[in-house]
């Protein structure tokens, strides 16, 4: 393939005019990914996924971007699967006092499942997205998600549950770039989306009001009481779906000192803590997966307990327990714990408990 702007590793292994299906949203990241792949000599087809009625604007934007770049953009309808695998569990988690991460669930269960199925149907070998991460093949032939060049835009956490079926066919063209570089490339390419705003965090709830979204579905979180740091009953709260571990604002409580949510109990009570008491050393996880499907070995890892949190050293016991070298803030049940070793994702599990 021709020498062009992408400095990423592994591109010399592809053949001229290899076909790639690019997941598009109409935003700057996926659009620049298309242009980079075109410059690398790939035959690019776009695909936009309709996850819910809230995605109609994204479908229109992706089709507009594809038209400008003179590529076909197919529309994949994943609404039923998205409801089953993402929306319903999201609502159930909040109603039970857990804090879900819908993107981490969606990527393996819906987004990349839909892209692979479409690629297979079209006879396309590779898939690609505009995520900020890298895919590299280790010495054992296992493809793994690696940290991107841009620590500020790192999305490896969101991709931490992908398996070999996806990883062995996945190309991530933006892994070597900073966001500002991507926007500058979009301007150089003359793309209309160059200055488009970044996508929202919860794509199926445009206004971000997830309690209202859940309640509109006829659901309610467990009722219970606030319990003070000293064990006193402070009266009822609004229902657990309105709260998350580590939260300080919006509690509606005045104790004369800052307090945080330390624990959302199974009975619906919410235990509060003074500043500094929302840190934990031991975290239990479930649903562990690894890139190669093998069991995650016991040992030392760097672990992220939230997407934006820095990875922290921890020892995994080989079963379900992490012990951090230093306390980590507010590891919330329902969130993902992403394990890293050597700059690569080694595994991923869901937090069930912290102490």
Placement of each model-derived feature along the sequence:
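ATP-dependent adenylation/nucleotidyltransferase module used to activate substrates
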Residues: 1-160, 171, 180-181, 261
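AMP-forming adenylation/ATP pyrophosphatase catalytic core
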Residues: 13-17, 128-135, 139-355
């Amino acid at each position: 393939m021709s020498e062009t702007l992408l400095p990423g590793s592994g591109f010399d292994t592809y053949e001229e005019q290899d076909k790639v299906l690019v997941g598009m949203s109409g935003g700057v990241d996926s659009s620049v990914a298309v242009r980079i792949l075109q410059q690398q000599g790939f035959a690019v087809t776009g695909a936009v996924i309709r996850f819910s009625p809230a995605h109609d604007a994204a479908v229109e934007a992706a089709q507009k971007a594809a038209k400008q770049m003179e590529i076909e953009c197919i529309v994949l309808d994943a609404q039923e699967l998205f409801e089953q695998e993402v929306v319903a569990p999201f609502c159930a988690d909040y109603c039970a006092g857990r804090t879900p991460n819908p993107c981490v669930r969606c990527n393996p269960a819906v987004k990349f499942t839909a892209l692979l199925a479409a690629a297979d149907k079209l006879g396309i070998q590779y898939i690609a997205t505009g995520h900020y991460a890298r895919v590299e093949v280790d010495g054992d032939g296992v493809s793994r998600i690696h940290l991107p060049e841009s620590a500020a835009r790192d999305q490896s956490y969101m991709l931490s549950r992908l398996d070999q079926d996806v990883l062995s066919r996945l190309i991530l063209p933006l892994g070597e770039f900073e966001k500002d570089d991507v926007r500058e490339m979009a301007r150089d390419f003359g793309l209309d989306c160059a200055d488009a705003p970044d996508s929202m965090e919860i794509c199926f709830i445009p206004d971000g009001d997830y309690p209202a979204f859940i309640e509109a579905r006829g659901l309610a979180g467990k009722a219970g009481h606030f319990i003070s740091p000293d064990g006193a009953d402070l009266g009822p709260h609004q229902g657990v779906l309105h709260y998350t571990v580590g939260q300080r604002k919006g509690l509606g409580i005045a104790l004369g000192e800052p307090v945080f949510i330390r624990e959302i109990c199974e009975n619906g009570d919410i235990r509060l803590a003074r500043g500094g008491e929302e840190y934990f050393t031991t975290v239990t996880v479930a649903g562990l997966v690894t890139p190669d499907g093998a069991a995650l070995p016991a040992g030392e890892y760097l672990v992220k307990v939230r997407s934006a949190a820095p990875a922290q050293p921890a020892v995994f016991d080989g079963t379900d327990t992490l012990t951090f070298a230093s306390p980590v803030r507010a590891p919330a049940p329902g969130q993902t714990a992403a394990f890293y070793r050597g700059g690569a994702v080694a595994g991923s599990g869901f937090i069930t408990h912290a102490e």
